[in-house]
Amino acid sequence: MEMEKRTPVLDGQGINTVLIRLAREIIQRHTNLEPLVIIGVHTRGVHLARRLADTIAEINGRAIPTGDIDITLYRDDWTKIGYSPVVQSTQIGFPIDDKTVILVDDVLFTGRTTRAALDALTDFGRPAKVELAVLVDREGMRELPIQADYVGMFVKTDKAEMVNVLLSETDGEDAVVVNTP
C-alpha cells in the first residue's frame, strides 16, 4: 500500500501571522467597520471567522458581528456526497441587509463552495457587498469565476493533491498541509 506524503505548508504561528495580516487588510480597506459582518462557512471557515473577528477587535477595539453558515444543501454536488448529508446549523443572529459581509472559508479550490455560500446568504437578506477571505487559495484550480478579496497564502498544487487546514478547534492542532497520493 502506498503512503500518502504529507508536506507542511504553514504551522500554528504562521496561521496566526496570516490572520493578523488579513485583519489589518480588512481594517485598512474598511475605514468604517460599522456595516461589516463576518460569516464563516462550516466547518473550518467558522473557526477562522471567529479568530479573524477576534483579531480585528484586538487591533481596532471594535467587535464585529460574527455568524456561520452551512452550505450543504446549496452544493451542486450534494447528491454525490451521500444520501444522508450531514447538515449543520446556520447561526446568523443579525440582519445582513445593506451590510458588507466578509465570507470566510479555509480553502478556495474550485469555487463551488463559495457559490453555494452566496446562494445560502440570499436566504438571509441582501447584503450591500460580499467579500471573500480565505486562508489558502489553490491557485489555478477554479471551475467558476470566483476570486478571493483577502488571501492568506497561495498554494500551487495539482488536482490529485489535497490541501488540508487543521485547526485546534476541530483537529487538535493548527497547520496547513498538502497531502500527495
Curated annotation (Swiss-Prot):
Provide a GO biological process annotation: regulation of DNA-templated transcription
Entry-linked InterPro entries: PRibTrfase_dom, PRTase-like, PyrR, PyrR_bifunctional
Which interval of the chain is the signal sequence?
A: none
| Assigned keywords, A-Z | Glycosyltransferase, Transcription, Transcription regulation, Transferase
GO MF, one term, reads:
uracil phosphoribosyltransferase activity
What EC number(s) does the entry state? 2.4.2.9
SUPFAM superfamilies documented for this protein: PRTase-like
Describe the family membership recorded for this protein in Swiss-Prot or TrEMBL. Answer: Belongs to the purine/pyrimidine phosphoribosyltransferase family. PyrR subfamily.
Q: What is this protein called?
A: Bifunctional protein PyrR
The species this protein belongs to is: Desulfosudis oleivorans (strain DSM 6200 / JCM 39069 / Hxd3) (Desulfococcus oleovorans)
